[in-house]
Amino acid sequence: MHPDLSPHLHTEECNVLINLLKECHKNHNILKFFGHCNDLDREMRKCLKNEYSERRTRSREHGAAMRRRLSDPPEEAGR
């Protein structure tokens, strides 16, 4: 099962692959069941996996920065 394939959620590169896969499924109604579009599907899943790992890395970095910010008391300028 794929994640939400809405265009606003993905990079342009992945959107191109998503659209190619959708076109392949549309043009090959029966052959898609016999693996005709599998290469496009693999490439799309690879792209989505890369997006996911990049988002996860950014989120971890952001979380670590927020934890550091909350655990370190701010310097008082007046004293």
UniProtKB/Swiss-Prot annotation:
Where in the cell does this protein reside?
A: Mitochondrion
* Ranges spanned by the short sequence motif Cx9C motif 2, renumbered to the chain: 37-47
The disulfide bonds in this chain are 14-47, 24-37
Q: What is its main location?
A: mitochondrion
Q: Which PROSITE patterns match?
A: CHCH (PS51808)
Q: What cellular-component terms does GO give this entry?
A: cytosol; mitochondrion
Pfam families with a match to the protein in the record: Cmc1
Record-annotated membrane-spanning stretches: none
Q: Which UniProt keywords apply?
A: Disulfide bond, Mitochondrion
Q: Where is this region: Disordered?
A: 50-79
The protein's matches in InterPro entries, at most eight in alphabetical order, are given as:
Cyt_c_biogenesis_Cmc1-like
Q: Where is this motif: Cx9C motif 1?
A: 14-24
Superkingdom of this entry's organism? Eukaryota
Give residue ranges for domain CHCH: 11-55
Q: Which family does it belong to?
A: Belongs to the CMC family.
Q: What role does this protein play?
A: May be involved in cytochrome c oxidase biogenesis.
What's this protein's name?
COX assembly mitochondrial protein 2 homolog
